[in-house]
Amino acid sequence: MFQTLAYYATVFHRSFTAYTSRHLQALGLNFGSLFPVIYVGKHPGCTQAQLTAALGLDWGYSQRTVTRLVEEGFLTREKSGRAYHLDLSPKGQQAFQVSHQVFFDWDEAALTPLDQKEREQLFALLAKVSGKEADSTCTKPFAAP
């Protein structure tokens, strides 16, 4: 039987997108807003250019997304010199908590068939093939200040 990583990546992506969309919809967010909200939550006061570069976004898409998030009350955008600095509003803080937690909740549901040792093996192998650290901030729950 021929298997590809791309197939499983697609299966997991679709499952994660559907799961996340259901949870974000209650807050008035869509899947496309997930990563900008998380980035600003982890990097308060960042500029839009920093957000755009860090997430690898197209400038136009980033502009539309940030404008929408500001208009809907999730982000604040304050001009400082020639740059705009982004922060989460109280509504954005709530969205950040839900958005961040959804990663761990989905993992728990998706990884139910695996025991702890198998989970550790899976993450070690994924870290190896992705070239990412197995102990990055994305793999640990967010501790609110």
Could you say what each language-model-derived stretch is?
Residues 1-27, 74, 85, 94, ...:
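N-terminal leader segment of winged-helix/HTH proteins
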Residues 26, 42, 98, 128, ...:
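Conserved amphipathic alpha-helical interaction elements at protein-protein interfaces in regulatory
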Residues 5, 32-33, 47, 84, ...:
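N-terminal positioning helix adjacent to the helix-turn-helix/winged-helix DNA-binding module
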Residues 17, 67-127:
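Charged, amphipathic alpha-helical coiled-coil/dimerization segments
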Residues 8, 33-39, 68, 102:
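Residue-level recognition of specific faces of alpha-helices
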Residues 118-145:
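Exposed, interaction-prone assembly regions rather than primary DNA-binding/catalytic cores
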Residues 14, 18-61, 73:
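N-terminal helix-turn-helix DNA-binding core of bacterial DNA-binding proteins
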